[in-house]
UniProtKB/Swiss-Prot annotation:
The keyword Cell cycle does not apply. F-type ATPases have 2 components, CF(1) - the catalytic core - and CF(0) - the membrane proton channel. Component of an ATP synthase complex composed of ATP5PB, ATP5MC1, ATP5F1E, ATP5PD, ATP5ME, ATP5PF, ATP5MF, MT-ATP6, MT-ATP8, ATP5F1A, ATP5F1B, ATP5F1D, ATP5F1C, ATP5PO, ATP5MG, ATP5MK and ATP5MJ. Interacts with PRICKLE3. It is found in: Mitochondrion membrane. It is a single-pass membrane protein. The modification N6-succinyllysine is found at residue 54. Keywords: Acetylation, ATP synthesis, CF(0), Hydrogen ion transport, Ion transport, Membrane, Mitochondrion, Transmembrane, Transmembrane helix, Transport. The keyword Lyase does not apply. This is ATP synthase protein 8. The chain crosses the membrane at residues 8-24. The gene is MT-ATP8. InterPro entries: ATP8_mammal, ATP8_metazoa. It comes from Alouatta sara. GO terms for biological process: proton motive force-driven ATP synthesis. Belongs to the ATPase protein 8 family. The lineage of its organism: Eukaryota, Metazoa, Chordata, Craniata, Vertebrata. Its main location: mitochondrion.
Amino acid sequence: MPQLDMSPWPMVIMSMILTLFYITQLKMLNFTFYNTPSSKLSMPHKHKTTWELKWTKIYLPPSMYQ
């Protein structure tokens, strides 16, 4: 039984990978990527939390009387 000559296989594999990469790039060239809407046009909505709505007094620790 004759043995299979393996010398051309690395070249075949490399050319296949290169061809697939080239075809993929050509397919992506026709694809339109839409830009995400910029946030500069719309003002960011600030959510009000409950602790921002009311004023809280900060107490100091009890001091020693002299």
